[in-house]
Design a protein with these regions (language model features):
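Amphipathic, Lys/Arg-enriched alpha-helical "gate/interface" segment within cytosolic domains
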Residues: 1-125
Length: 125
């Protein structure tokens, strides 16, 4: 399954919402990073004050190279979010994103996007 992603910025909430699916190749990851950077330029909050909601329920298991590339993206201090909520469905995908997001304030949610969004915006489940 080829990769697909959608990234939307909500400047009023200081929120970046990311939906990802499929299997990511190197070119897909570069396109994702460019789109993420463009979405960040729409935010009005201060640096590193935004929130990020990521839905990877439809994402396939990724190669080790892809996991490493996503880790580099997540480790970029210029785009580091205050909090990240990640909605996952597969155990292995969850383990992969945990490796990629090891240095971040992340909460993981199984299948429930609304619970994840509530935690992100209100700080509680």
């Amino acid at each position: 399954m080829p990769s697909e992603f959608a990234i939307a910025a909500d400047p009023l909430l200081g929120l970046i919402q990311i939906d990802m699916s499929g299997f990511f190749l190197e070119a897909d990851i570069h396109a994702f990073e460019e789109a993420r950077n463009k979405a960040h330029s729409q935010l009005r909050c201060g640096p590193n004050e935004h929130l990020t909601l990521v839905d990877i329920r439809s994402m396939q298991i990724q190669s080790q190279e892809a996991v490493a590339a996503f880790k580099c993206i997540l480790d970029n201090p210029a785009y580091k979010s205050k909090r990240i909520a990640i909605v996952v469905s597969h155990t292995l995908a969850r383990m992969q994103i945990q490796r990629a997001a090891v240095n971040r304030d992340v909460m993981y949610f199984s299948e429930d996007l609304l619970v994840a969004r509530n935690w992100l915006l209100n700080g509680c489940i």
